[in-house]
Amino acid sequence: MEPVHAIELRHITKRFGKVVANDGIDLAINRGEILSLLGENGSGKTTLMNMLSGIYLPDEGEILADGKPVTIRSPKDAFAHGIGMIHQHYKLVEVFTAAENIALGLKGKEHDRKAVAAQVQAISDKYGFGIDPNKKVYDMSVSEKQTVEIVKVLYRGAEILILDEPTAVLTPQETERLFNILRAMKADGKAIVIITHKLHEVMALSDKVAVLRKGKYIGTVNTCDTNPQKLTEMMVGHAVTLNIDRPQAKYKDLRLEVKGLNCRNGEGLPVLKDISFQAFGGEILGIAGIAGSGQKELLEAIAGLQKADSGHIFYYPPHPESDIAGHHVPVDKAGEELVGKTPGQIRKVGVSLAFVPEDRLGMGLVGGMGMVDNMMLKTYKDTPGPLVDRKTPKALAEKLIDELEIVTPGVATPVRRLSGGNVQKVLVGREIASTPTVLMTAYPVRGLDINSSYTIYRLLNEQKMKEVAVLLVGEDLDVLLELCDRILVLCGGQVSGIVDGPTATKEQVGLLMTHVGGGKEGEDRA
């Protein structure tokens, strides 16, 4: 007699118009097991799990819970079958306590404040969450908010938990704590599904790995019988080199210097406190920190988008007689002050600065425009005369489609119709094509599949070797440690340390992300 699976998907198909997101997928989820769900962007991972959690209905196929066919039309139906999903973007009311958020929408005396707090405490003690039921959400760290989301689905009786990119904004220490909690739930007989791009986490945590490719089910393997290389080949269908290079540029001239920078947000609260560092052409300077530590504000201040209360940002242009071919003249010592200048004024004084913001469509691109018009946003003011050059940006758009493998019906298709990963490729490609001397990019591979991610790493290294100063805000510490020459760590809007990329460890950077002080500040260079 075959074992009964907690959840079994049979021949599941889901279409959105002419696009087949899931094509006849079969998948089994078992109790007491952690299953990682892998696949490139657009492979259908989240769509498949959204059908389990009641957000979508399958067009074809059936879902079995404990061997019996079920219909899941809503998240309420999903909970009735013991299925709970923790999404990447948390759905909590900031002014409510943990207990109030967990009980939100539930009726009856058994869900009054005192009863909920007691049950939340019991769940917390059982799995080691360490949650305070009476703590307000706005006082919580990112990992605490995630904990509340997990407890919320457990409180509603979930036996099958689905987590979408659960470690995206966690420190290494918080990630290990989450893994210990998931292992405890697995030991208690829960079935757990993890959607992730991080292969090292797949290998460290999961029992089995299921792989999707272009909406089709490729197979499920035991984690102990595979490795990152094999999993990557299953995802993309061909061999892929997973090495991240760290080439060394011949020259490293001072390109950017930040001194005592202080900034406030729109509510008048300090977001950057006495920030000082240097960035050099021919290096990649990583910027690490938990979410909300000031990464976004720092890049925006340098770009002229965030007003500075005090401090200085000096730009040092390459010597005009230097060239990529190898002729090098040391940088002029007189720096150009950027504080107080708008982005337009920064451009007018000759600062060649490219910025890939975190908010792609809100700040970086115009969603209603096609690729050609979005390319022109960077250059249309440079065209002399009344007529705007469209041939050059069209040629650039076609070149980027080819080089970055951007999936789009055409260069005139509004970019908002593209997948998130393809939108990122458009923005990164445009900024790199502007031949900057300073390239700032925030989370350039967020949402990208592994093939596209390694393409972006290669492009960043190419800019570095052209003596561009690259500032890279990232969330994957493994990548930052492999790719960056130095890593600046922010904590609470302050520089908690600047470490050497080749010699630093995840644990060292993780501690600096949560503690100000103890790191090596300043700009000591060999």
Cite the ranges covered by each PLM segment:
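Glycine-rich phosphate-binding loops of nucleotide-dependent enzymes
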Residues: E2-A526
